[in-house]
């Protein structure tokens, strides 16, 4: 019994050393991503996955993403309206590909890891939204996740909208919105009604795109909430520390 106990203790120490090495590598990779000129959203999401799955092979994920992108691209053409583009993308992702939206549950950390969302074809609003935006980025569709409270909403902007140069109210440059959980489109009036139900006055901030860095920061913060048991305190602290690297 003593021998097995000592053996288990040694094994745990070895596992913690390996985990710490992986974590240090992940810290460095995240800093490199943060400081790079272009913050690729898929790469950022894969870094979050590698916290729990450090040996994750990325090639199958990239292949899955490319299959979806190509299926959508084949259905798109320059004559489609933005709403028609959204309908094509949502139809392929949520019907043909059969992506499902699930409620946020901190009991299921896999729902926050992009490779698991692709593998199991189900994700919560945040991960489905990130996947949707990745597709829009790859297809040159000007659609971004915005700052609507308690929701993950994708705004389809006018093709000439650029958040870095636009001076007016960003809502004026939005055609419509898509619910990341289901892929369904809805109108400005629907958003106005939502703010009324919250008794909240909408501001320009709510309609600005979230940066890729901000999205990955939020994703890390959400994953951290999955590790709130005493045995996982160190993981929660590490995830919060990673999130704090992103401003």
Regions found by a protein language model. Give the residues of each.
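A structural boundary/capping signal
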Residues: 1-247
